[in-house]
Amino acid sequence: MSSRGVTAPQGFVAAGATAGIKPSGNKDMALVVNQGPEFVGAAVFTRNRVVASPVKYTKKAVANGTLRAVLYNSGNANACNGVQGDKDVHEIVDYLASKLKVDPLDIAACSTGLIGEPLPVTMIKAGVDKLIPALGDNGGEAADSIMTTDTVAKETVVKCNGWTLGGMGKGVGMMAPSLATMLVCLTTDACVTQAQAHAALSKACDVTFNTLDIDGSTSTNDTVILLANGASGITPTESEFNDAVLQACADIADQLQADAEGVTKRVRITVTGTTTDSQALNAARTLGRDNLFKCAMFGSDPNWGRVLAAVGMADADMDPDNISVYFNDQPVCLQSGGTPEARQVDLSGIDIDVRVDLGTGGPGKAFVRTTDLSHQYVEINSAYSS
């Protein structure tokens, strides 16, 4: 995808900078600015009840009806910092607003990094001073600046009929439905209302980011933001706009899965044959979070017994004597018993498709995306601490 990302649509500028938050010295702040003429903003947030200070603030900003800018910092989550964390995000946003000459509630704030560490306000203000003069066609630098344990920047561009949608994202660990530990910013020069933007974003998140389950942990900071400015002068149909937002979210979700911490396998789990879609989703998530199953995927082992043991724990209607399991479309378990060719199924490739029929004949169906559990995942997360 284009390295321009969030600056691919007309009327958006961005920048990345080093404020010194990360001990590595890598870039750790980004700014995306909507130059108008319209300033539509919509967002979807974490469902974790422990919510970071920037999420609290950005919820208020989005409810205000307009968004002109999004400020990002990486290396510090500003989560679980109590009242001081709330004060700090207000102070930083007020500082940026004074520089941009806009209302503070026209600015969203997003943070990612270590939880429970005080926000280095002085550093971040100095970072703001670097970002503003650097604003331009710098979507790639902004995407680089929001990474934490990511190994590559994640960007997308969707070219439509006279209008464009761009985006960037970050996140490779602590991923589970309710987004993932991730921040995503989408921008478009299409003419849309806030209601249209919110509806499209919510629908897209449900079938992309909310199906991504790397390790069962849900972040305090998840935020997906969509900015629209109408600079193209084009008003797409509802279907056209929904499709573009879905395409962008799906692309970023694929990139998140591919760069998940320690990933050696990309696994898609589809569950059918239960009473409702929600039951199927529960079973798929239960399997996707099961460590024994994930270890089997790391070892390229078509261990259908671990699949049955995992889905048996799910809150879903099933016929325990009639469950079928397929790896890469090859039957390894039929009517809850192994097939003769089960151990010969080749799972040595990066992508593994797992299909489970719970055997009730019901219409319920759902899928999730996950990864294996590797040595590197443990190494990364044992080293990532305060």
Swiss-Prot record:
InterPro entries: Arg_biosynth_ArgJ, ArgJ-like_dom_sf, ArgJ_beta_C. It is an enzyme of class 2 (transferase). Keywords: Acyltransferase, Amino-acid biosynthesis, Arginine biosynthesis, Autocatalytic cleavage, Cytoplasm, Multifunctional enzyme, Transferase. The record marks A180, T181 as: Cleavage. It catalyses: N(2)-acetyl-L-ornithine + L-glutamate = N-acetyl-L-glutamate + L-ornithine; L-glutamate + acetyl-CoA = N-acetyl-L-glutamate + CoA + H(+). GO terms for biological process: L-arginine biosynthetic process; ornithine biosynthetic process. The record marks T112, G113 as: Involved in the stabilization of negative charge on the oxyanion by the formation of the oxyanion hole. It is found in: Cytoplasm. GO terms for cellular component: cytoplasm. Its EC number is 2.3.1.35, 2.3.1.1. Its main location: cytoplasm. GO terms for molecular function: glutamate N-acetyltransferase activity; L-glutamate N-acetyltransferase activity. Pathway: Amino-acid biosynthesis; L-arginine biosynthesis; L-ornithine and N-acetyl-L-glutamate from L-glutamate and N(2)-acetyl-L-ornithine (cyclic): step 1/1; Amino-acid biosynthesis; L-arginine biosynthesis; N(2)-acetyl-L-ornithine from L-glutamate: step 1/4. It holds the Pfam family ArgJ. The keyword NAD does not apply. Substrate binds at T148, K170, T181, E261, N381, S386. The keyword Acyltransferase applies. The active site is at T181. It comes from the Bacteria. Belongs to the ArgJ family. Catalyzes two activities which are involved in the cyclic version of arginine biosynthesis: the synthesis of N-acetylglutamate from glutamate and acetyl-CoA as the acetyl donor, and of ornithine by transacetylation between N(2)-acetylornithine and glutamate. Heterotetramer of two alpha and two beta chains. This is Arginine biosynthesis bifunctional protein ArgJ. It comes from Corynebacterium diphtheriae (strain ATCC 700971 / NCTC 13129 / Biotype gravis). The gene is argJ.
